[in-house]
Amino acid sequence: MINIRKTHPLMKIVNNAFIDLPAPSNISSWWNFGSLLGICLILQILTGLFLAMHYTSDTMTAFSSVTHICRDVNYGWIIRYMHANGASMFFICLFIHVGRGLYYGSYTFLETWNIGVILLFTVMATAFVGYVLPWGQMSFWGATVITNLLSAIPYIGTNLVEWIWGGFSVDKATLTRFFAFHFILPFIITALAMTHLLFLHETGSNNPTGIPSDMDKIPFHPYYTIKDILGMLLLILILMLLVLFMPDLLGDPDNYTPANPLSTPPHIKPEWYFLFAYAILRSIPNKLGGVLALALSILVLTLMPLLHTSKQRSMMFRPLSQCLFWILVADLLTLTWIGGQPVEHPFITIGQLASIMYFSLILVLMPAASMIENNLLKW
């Protein structure tokens, strides 16, 4: 009798994706983050669903409904903090996942990579509208400042911002539509993630060497299922340490003050995972220039396949490129730090230098280093 998992129309899809999938025998723990992102997404959808059962998207009651969830709903506090800190874990996994793709040249899978970039944008949009929902001070002012950036678009900017707001300022209409967006976007992310996986399985996974591994494949189950479960346990351990011991570590104290349009917080800043882009935005004195730099800081990822000048796919055997890659990581950490600092000397200068460094590394230095390495191979 033929195994049902190989013949049943639905189970066949699951089997080909998670059980009998031929996987390279040498993929390291950096390949765990795709499955961890899947776990994060499921966790966020589930906790978000339970939060939505008690949340009200009205400016008068939004803040108190979140307080009600934490105080009066059974285990509401843990659901709320798992959702808030789950977003941070999501972005940590995302950044590592993208970094892995850059390091090992996974961007040569064009469709998979471009859908991944769209996914990154969608997750960032979801996190942004989600941050507005508790209707604290930073929620309100973050929404005002970031949506206002669109007014820099020539000719249609002001109309576009007022259309997004649903009025002449961030108000009830804005909060209601942001809640609607925050509810629907995770399902769009799920569909995109499935497409991402579909295109990945057309080519098969990359591996640390960047060399085709067709002659050396092993079944995904049990080898990588066990490996993924270990990663999942570590992820949940770190998440629960955050939730149970320091739930507000990554949040902003200003968000425990109800939104007040008449009082501006001293330092308006987004959540930590947007700080690198926020620092790039602030480092340019011109509004439109800043908005373009902000968009380009992520869009530059779509250029990676075009900027790949090396004869080797992976950075595993390219010490010069490795060095520049880790400088890029340090630069992003610097930008993240600067984004959380007030706009004053010396932070302005550091931010501008780090922003120049960011684009120089990706657009000029790394392709140049790859060409130097190509020439070294001829020696």
Curated annotation (Swiss-Prot):
Cellular-component GO terms for this entry: mitochondrial inner membrane; respiratory chain complex III
Annotated residues for binding of heme b b566: H97, H196
UniProt key word Transmembrane helix: yes
Cofactor: binding comment: Binds 2 heme b groups non-covalently.
Keywords, alphabetical: Electron transport, Heme, Iron, Membrane, Metal-binding, Mitochondrion, Mitochondrion inner membrane, Respiratory chain, Transmembrane, Transmembrane helix, Transport, Ubiquinone
GO biological process per UniProt: mitochondrial electron transport, ubiquinol to cytochrome c
Cofactors (names): heme b
Positions annotated to bind a ubiquinone: H201
Membrane topology, from the record: Multi-pass membrane protein
GO terms of molecular function: metal ion binding; ubiquinol-cytochrome-c reductase activity
Residue ranges crossing the lipid bilayer per the database entry: 33-53, 77-98, 113-133, 178-198, 226-246, 288-308, 320-340, 347-367
Stored InterPro entries: Cyt_b/b6_C, Cyt_b/b6_C_sf, Cyt_b/b6_N, Cytb/b6-like_sf, Cytochrome_b, Cytochrome_b_C_euk/bac, Cytochrome_b_N_euk/bac, Di-haem_cyt_TM
Annotated compartments: Mitochondrion inner membrane
Amino-acid positions noted as binding heme b b562 in the UniProt annotation, renumbered to this chain: H83, H182
Other observations noted: Heme 1 (or BL or b562) is low-potential and absorbs at about 562 nm, and heme 2 (or BH or b566) is high-potential and absorbs at about 566 nm.
Cited function: Component of the ubiquinol-cytochrome c reductase complex (complex III or cytochrome b-c1 complex) that is part of the mitochondrial respiratory chain. The b-c1 complex mediates electron transfer from ubiquinol to cytochrome c. Contributes to the generation of a proton gradient across the mitochondrial membrane that is then used for ATP synthesis.
Annotated family: Belongs to the cytochrome b family.
Quaternary structure note: The cytochrome bc1 complex contains 11 subunits: 3 respiratory subunits (MT-CYB, CYC1 and UQCRFS1), 2 core proteins (UQCRC1 and UQCRC2) and 6 low-molecular weight proteins (UQCRH/QCR6, UQCRB/QCR7, UQCRQ/QCR8, UQCR10/QCR9, UQCR11/QCR10 and a cleavage product of UQCRFS1). This cytochrome bc1 complex then forms a dimer.
Name used for this protein in its record: Cytochrome b
Organism: Okapia johnstoni (Okapi)
Protein's gene: MT-CYB
